[in-house]
From Swiss-Prot:
Presence of the UniProt keyword Transcription in the record: yes
Annotated compartments: Cytoplasm
Keywords: Cytoplasm, DNA-binding, Repressor, Transcription, Transcription regulation
Functional description taken from the UniProt entry: DNA-binding global transcriptional regulator which is involved in the adaptive response to starvation and acts by directly or indirectly controlling the expression of numerous genes in response to nutrient availability. During rapid exponential growth, CodY is highly active and represses genes whose products allow adaptation to nutrient depletion.
GO molecular function: DNA binding; DNA-binding transcription factor activity; GTP binding
Protein name per its UniProtKB record: Global transcriptional regulator CodY
Family of the protein in this entry: Belongs to the CodY family.
Length: 250
């Protein structure tokens, strides 16, 4: 397979980005095929995002428990540019790895270290063509990690905005009711006895019901009546608890 053909294989994954999330296991599998090595895609914290083994070289330590040992990950993070064809130096304590050829490619994006691409072979050293493909693959992985992070940030902002808008619709009495309800629950779900809250705050049960309805219609909570026992409440948007805690501090 020529360098161009190998690059085109990776391009097919890149073309999916934005339409559907990149499958890191698929990415590792394609890199394994084009580079002919065991491939591990690691997050910054050492979590195994994807891996694919060409042969059993005794390097299962990198797939075990879906994360590599912290000490090893720290060593990988200290590699700031491609380290090619390491032989028994990086992981010298591991006898199984002593005779293997290891290449480490940092995954960077947005000025940050996002993870590590690890390539392992038993004999033949990695060529310049292999390293070009590996670094290109690391770039594709970095772009996908950044995209996922941006989506997560956007989703967090959306959830917070929904909570803030819902809180803004509450009357003073309803806000006091909500504050007391979640102080009473002490967590993301629990049983609410409306009459108990009403007596404590000095409001009517209808105020509590209205406040809960507003939050339920906003998709922030769900509630289920248990008759005489009370109402079971579960928080669907965890930003609610954060905003209430912030109000308490302010």
């Amino acid at each position: 397979m020529t360098l161009l053909e190998k690059t085109r294989k990776l391009n097919r994954i890149l073309q999916k980005t934005g339409i559907q999330p990149v499958d890191f296991m698929e990415m590792a599998s394609i890199l394994k095929e084009v580079i002919e090595a065991n491939v591990y895609i690691l997050s910054r914290k050492g979590k195994v995002l994807g891996y694919s083994a060409l042969k059993d070289y005794g390097d299962e330590i990198f797939a075990k428990d879906k994360a590599i040992p912290e000490e090893y990950n720290d060593r990988l993070l200290r590699v700031t540019e491609t380290l090619a064809n390491d032989k028994g130096k990086l992981f010298k304590e591991e006898k199984a790895l002593a005779d293997l050829i290891v290449t480490v490619v940092p995954i960077n994006g947005g000025g940050d270290r996002l993870g590590t691409l690890l390539l392992i072979r038993s004999t033949k050293e990695f060529t310049d063509d292999d390293l070009i493909i590996a670094e290109y693959g690391a770039t594709v992985v970095g772009l996908e990690i950044l995209r996922a992070k941006n989506e997560e940030i956007e989703e967090e902002a959306r959830k917070r905005a929904v909570v803030q808008m819902a809180l803004a619709t509450l009357s003073y009495s309803e806000l006091q009711a909500i504050k007391n309800i979640f102080e009473e629950l002490k967590g993301k779900e629990g049983l609410l006895v409306a009459s108990k809250i009403a007596d404590k705050v000095g409001i009517t049960r209808s105020v509590i019901v209205n406040a809960l309805r507003k939050f339920e219609s906003a998709g922030i909570i769900e509630s289920r009546s248990l008759g005489m026992k009370g109402t079971h409440i579960r928080v669907l948007n965890e930003k609610l608890l954060e905003e209430l805690e912030k109000m308490k501090r302010d």
